[in-house]
Structures are given as C-alpha cells and as structure tokens.
Amino acid sequence: GSSALGFWNEFIDFDKKHVELIGVEAKYAAPLSTNAKVAILHGAAQYCLTDKEGQIAETHSLSAGLDYPGSSPLHGLLKDSGRARYTNASDKEALAAFKLITKLEDIRPSLEPAHAWSECIRLAPKLKKSDVIVVNNCGKGYKDKKIYIEQLGYYPK
C-alpha cells in the first residue's frame, strides 16, 4: 500500500502507455483485484472485502503486511481512474517467486515484494526484450525467515 504509493510517486505522471503501474495483492486479501465494494474501514471509505452481511471479511496471507481487508483510498482512486491496475498472487506463487529470485538474482525479498516478483515472473515472458520492469523490492526476507523455513524447509544463506 503505502510503500507502493511512495515508489510510484516518481512514475505516476508518466503516460500510461509508457509506464504501467501494477499493484499486487495477496490472493485472499485482495480488495482491489476482486469485486470488492467500497465500505468504511477505520474511518475511511475504501475498497474492502466484506461478507454477505456487509461486515468486514476475514483475510489470509503469509505476509502480515498484505493480510488486510481494505486498501488505501488513493489506491482506489488510481484503480477507478485506470491509472493503476491490480492483480494478486497466492502464498504459493509468492513462495515460488522467492525461490526463483533468490536463485537467479541472489536477492531475498520479504513476503510483500515476493508477491510483486510473482507478477513480474508472470508478465516478463509477454514483453519485448527492450521493455523494462521495475519492482519495488521494499523489504528484506530476513524478517520473514521463520515463515520461509516453515513453508520451504530452509532459508538461503
């Protein structure tokens, strides 16, 4: 959320044809990439996951930073205006991205950017070789070391 907004600040005024902003949410905490409705959460109108009764829904993600039913109102504005698009990645996809990026680039992303790396891996084969992808690798994986060990059985040195 806020990390992406800060990162996008330098790119937001570029023409959408030249710079696409893609936000990646956790699959089971994804109000912007699903059919979530606008609701009030913590005093702000925002896209929010709700249950059948309109109450705030439960979410799940291995990533504590993405395990949240709402979204920044600014992300909602970017979605509604078409300036940004949002997708999501499952825990399994984020873990697979962590493994690949660690192996190929010797980068150990935290769980939050591992979701973004997952989208990068999905998107890259569809692009021209001259296209550039910039990923906000905003956190070190060491903070999620325990989760990586529980899920993968190891944490790379």
PLM regions and their residue ranges:
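Active-site/ligand-binding loops adjacent to catalytic centers
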Residues: 13-18, 23-107, 111, 150-157
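Short glycine/serine/threonine-rich phosphate/pyrophosphate-binding segments
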Residues: 1-8, 31-32, 113-120, 142-145
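Anionic group-transfer/hydrolysis microenvironments
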Residues: 27, 114, 138
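Short, flexible coil/turn micro-motifs enriched in small/turn-prone residues
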Residues: 1, 49, 101, 134-136
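Gly/Ser/Thr-rich helix-start
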Residues: 2-3, 7, 24, 66, ...
